[in-house]
Amino acid sequence: MKKIIINGSFLCRNLTGIERFSLEICKRLDFLDKNNLFELYVPKDVQFIPELSNLKITISDSNLKKFPLWDHFTFPKYVRKQKSISLDFANLTSLFHPGLVFIHDIYAKLYPQDFTFPKDKLRRFYMCWMYNHAIKKGKHIFTVSEFSKNQIIETYKVDSKKITVIPNGWDHFKSIKEDESVLKAFPQLHKQKFYFTLGSLQKRKNLIWLVKYAKNHPEEIFAISGKAINGMVSNEISSLESLSNIVLLGYVSDEQVKALMKNCKAFIFPSYYEGFGIPPLEALSVGSKIVVSDIPCFKEIYKASAYYIDPNNPNVNLSDLLKTQVSSAEELLNYYTYDNAAKKLYNTLININQKI
C-alpha cells in the first residue's frame, strides 16, 4: 500500500477547532499505525512538534508563510516525490495533485453575506474555490457530521459514497487540569451564578444574540472569553463594553476555559451555523449544562442532552429553560471521542488505499 502523508501545516496555527481536531487525530493514528503507513510533513516554522512513536515526522526546508505555496506546491511536490497519497485536514487539497481531504463545513459557500469587507470577500472566494476543487477532484472526502455531508451532497451534487463522516471528540479535555484562578481574577463570577461563552470574530458565532439577551436581563451575569469585540461591525457587538452584566475575560487558557465551563450556570453557544461545534461537547464532559441553537447540526450531535434556543430570537428566559429536564449526556460522550473517530478514519483510509 502507498504511504499516506498528512499536511502538517495545522501545527503552525493556534489550536482552535480544525487544528485541535487535526492534532488529536494524528496522536491516535500514531497509536494505530503499527505498520508505518502514515507520515506527517510539516513546515519549518511549526509552533511545536508533537511527540509521536510510529508516525514519522518530516520537517520541510520551507515555511508555511509562503502562502499558498505550501499547500499547492511544496507539500504536494513532496507527496509526489514519495509516490504517496496526501491527506489534508483543513478544507483544501492541492490544485495539481489532489488527494484525501476533510471538508468540515461549507460556511463560506452558504453565507456570502457574512463576508463584507474586501479582504473577507477575497478570502471567501478562495475558500469556495477550494471547496469546489476538493469536492470535485479529491480522491475521497471526509466531513464531521451527517449534516455537513448532506449539505455537501446537495450543494455540489457529489455521490454520497465519496464522503465519510468522521466526527469530532472531547477526550483531549481529560488531560487538561482546570485553573480556577480566572474566577478569582473576576470577582463578579460566582460559581454556578454566571453564563459562559467563547468570544469569536466569526459572525456565525452569533454573539449578537447574547448581547440582546443580556440587555433584557441585567440581573444575569455573562462571561465572554477571547477577543469578542475587535473586528466586529455590528453596533450591538461594540456595545458589549457598556453592559455592566457582561464580563470580558480577554484571552483565557484551556485550563481556565475548563474551569469556567465547570463552574458556570450554563455554557451558551448561539451559533446559527456549524459543521459540528466542539465547545458544547467539552462543556458536557465537565458536567455543565449547555444552551445551544436549535439548528440541524446541534440537533444531530446533542439530541436531547441540550437546552435549545432560537438563534434569531433572544426573547426567552434561560433560568426557566434550565429548570426543564434534559437527557443524560453519557451516551453521546461515549460516542463522540477522538479514539472512536481515529479508528474509523484509520479503517477507512486502509480500505481506500487498497483501491487506489
Regions picked out by a protein language model, each given a short descriptive name:
Residues M1-I356:
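Carbohydrate transferase catalytic cores enriched for Leloir-type hexosyltransferases
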